[in-house]
Amino acid sequence: MIENGQATVARNPVLFFLFIYKNTIGQRFPAINPFIYGGFLEHGANIINHTMWAEIFHDRKFYYGIQEKEEAKPDPSNFRAAMAYIHKWTAIGPMSDIFLDKTAPYVGEQSPGAKLGSAPRGFAQSHISLVRGKAYTGRIVVSAEQDTEITLTLIEELNRQTVKLKAGKAWSTVPFSFTAASDTTEARFEITATGSGSFRVGAVSMMPADNIKGFRADTIALMKEMDCKTLRMPGGNFISAYDWKHTIGDPDKRPPIFDPVWKALQPNDAGLDELLQMCELINCVPNWCVNTGYGEPRSGAEIVEYVNGAPDTFWGAKRAANGRVQPYKVKYWNIGNEMYGHWQFGHMSRDQYVIKHNLFADAMRKVDPSIYIIVPGGFVDEMTTGQGIFIAGQPQVHVGSERDWAYGMLKHSMGKFDALATHAYPPENKRFDLKTGKLFDVQQTLTEWARQPAQRIATMADAWEEYKKHFPVLNEGKIKVFFDEWAFSFRDSYKGTLAVALAFHEFFKHTDFIEMAGYTMATAWMNVNPTTSSISAKGRVFQLYNQHFGSIPVGISGNSPQPAPQYPAGGDQPKVNTGSATYPLDVIAALTADGKTLTVAVVNPTESAQSLELTLEGFQSSSQGRVWSLVGKSLDATNAPGKQPDVVIKDAAFDARTRRFQLAPATIQIYHFPKSS
């Protein structure tokens, strides 16, 4: 709902009938799995390291060594480069006094050092954000050619704090702490010494003292408030060049690596144990993705044993030695990510990959037969719209063809998985042309714009119906679909919440086989800067449905059908446009699990006010109801960190005997009709 917006009331109200039969079997549908409100969290670039992880320093293990001067920030429009950007360490004193020990480094391929003299020598990192009065704790791993006093200095404009520590020939880890004197984004941290000889630094770390197992207290609190049911992680394309063994054990001894997928430094600090423990902190079920790109079945079996094995197994013992005796008992395992994509590290043909998958599944289930396996689906709609190999003159991928990845998985790997994964990232204001295989710009109304993600869910559902004809076992309902990557309009805005709401409505229509959805990225539920955070506009719409919509969808009908498709079915165009027969509104209903409350969600994705008349059949409501509304100051409204939110959820009482409702422009509302006693 747009507050204080100008609206034109529709002349003709939409008459919409909601039927809930006393014979409840006929019009009730399978329950909504709460995993529909799940997230996807890729460990690429700074996605986790600069939002969830509490580390203050960039490149704390000196992968890039020491620079003579700061590098310029990349153009923000270069999304990937901006995501990968980090602050580098710079020299204090001449570069000729700086060296990199590649012979006996503490971790990784090099450890920096400085030759000493009468003037301070060492290195520094700038542009550090701090909060006044907040305590920060850290540690530094140091050694010196001879006994040397090293000075750590935290500089905030005119304020300087110092900590002095001793270093000797052997590497030693020394703790330190500071309390910030100001709110700043431009603090500087220096590591220096004077005298003779030289000193080296193996690693250095500093975090807010209130960190929770290495994670930011503020973003952990927000993710817990989001009540996220499941997270798919740590990839993503990232996973296909990821070695999980680099991410366990002493964090200071984990090698920093250059991630070739995101072209970014990965310090491997938020590792396997940390991410699984993060899920425990926020009460979330992990869905772990395994590397089938550069990985091999042995590695898949080993990670299952590390995560789920008893402490007397080989890898379970290593987990116990790393501080976690009890197994994590992870049930959901994503074997591979988008392996149908030619861009995927380790990509191979479909007919070769199914063999590799089967080897992975057998090896992993030998370790733990109870695991639930999800595989890269690559449905024909996804393969047509850019995820598959393009053939000139044949842009559309048909069910059963060689380019239909899902068909190959169903044909050759049936029994080796429990669910197929599919992904969708529809571009804004574009349509896919089935004749040319190209995207074309289109002028769209707000309604057409907002329904694009829902349309892609529907094209996948169309494909599923075709797969059921080829593989009748799918009709039994045991094999599910995990829509574990989806997003639209990566800018956070109230406008984008309309698209999310309509996508939810489409998901709710397919509860017989869509078991999970993972929004890209789960961190998009928050807006974050280095010191504070807030739940984003999109986060609020997830909360609205997660907290207030029912779990048992019921049948509805209306007298205003959605318009017929403008374009031929296929690619990004479903056979029938999405939405309920209440055009231009979209309405969906569900009972709560106990059957005591009927919830009705209404989206007005237009820029005009609309009217709606409601009839309930087979359900007698009490007189007092409640309505929850998502309210934004404008379509562009967002929730900036540290400021009053511009997108909020508001609730109010209403007369549940009312049957006519006025819907403001760009409205998302959920009505509760309690059942009369």
What kind of region is each of these model predictions?
Residues 18-268, 285, 301, 351, ...:
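Extracellular and organelle-lumenal recognition/adhesion modules and their flexible linkers in secreted
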Residues 141-145, 179-181, 547, 603-605, ...:
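Solvent-exposed strand-to-loop "edge" motifs in beta-rich extracellular domains
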Residues 181, 188, 208-228, 275, ...:
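An active-site-proximal structural segment forming one wall of the substrate-binding cleft
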Residues 187-191, 350-504, 560-578:
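Noncatalytic carbohydrate-binding groove/subsite architecture in carbohydrate-active enzymes
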Residues 193, 234-235, 314-348, 423-428, ...:
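Active-site groove signature of glycoside hydrolases
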Residues 508-598, 607-610:
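Aromatic- and carboxylate-lined catalytic core of secreted/periplasmic carbohydrate-active enzymes
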Residues 580-623, 627, 632, 666-672:
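Carbohydrate-binding surface patches
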Residues 619-663:
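Acidic, Ser/Thr/Pro-rich beta/coil linker or hinge segments at domain junctions
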